[in-house]
UniProtKB/Swiss-Prot annotation:
Lineage, uppermost ranks: Bacteria, Pseudomonadati, Pseudomonadota, Alphaproteobacteria, Rickettsiales
UniProt region (Disordered), positions on chain: 1-37
PROSITE patterns registered for this protein in UniProt: GRPE
Family that this chain belongs to: Belongs to the GrpE family.
Xref: HAMAP family: GrpE
SUPFAM superfamilies: Coiled-coil domain of nucleotide exchange factor GrpE, Head domain of nucleotide exchange factor GrpE
Gene3D superfamilies documented for this protein: 3.90.20.20, Head domain of nucleotide exchange factor GrpE
A family per Pfam: GrpE
InterPro entries: GrpE, GrpE_coiled_coil, GrpE_head
Protein name in UniProt: Protein GrpE
PANTHER family: GRPE PROTEIN, GRPE PROTEIN HOMOLOG, MITOCHONDRIAL
Main location: cytoplasm
Amino acid sequence: MSDSSKERKKKFTGMVNKQKSEDQQNNSKQADDLDELKTLKERAVQLEDHLRRAVADNENVKRIMQKQISDANDYAVTKFARDMIDSCDNLKRVMEILKDDDPVHEGIKVAYKKIMNDLKKHGIEEIDPIGELFDSNLHQAVVEREDNEKKTGTIVEVLQTGYTIKNRLLRPAMVIISKKNC
């Protein structure tokens, strides 16, 4: 082989090796790029998941806050309502003491009915449990009375009227319940 042929072969081999080296570098760069792309995709999935959770948490907080605001509006008058029902109890006691034909009795009766109507407009309802079975969520049993005609636990008398405000207990009814004579 001649020197020029050797030189061409060497040059050709050098070019092939250079090309192989460049191909390997390109392949290595492509592999690095693919790894980076895979990592970025995984990170995007994680961020998307975090975003979904954050949006869901935000919606939950919003719903809870709306419920709390609604409850605050509904039950803000609770203390005032308790004071008013105590006043109604006092008016009832006065009406029981006064005679029906007393003009003061009639005036108190009108005032009592007006207050009760106003309370009802604001979601405050009386609990009238006579004849119902005792329910510890709504009633407070004060006395048991023997009564063989009624089922045990039936409310036979109300000592103090109970009230609810928008279906939530404001004050339990104080009651006398029946029990069987053993």
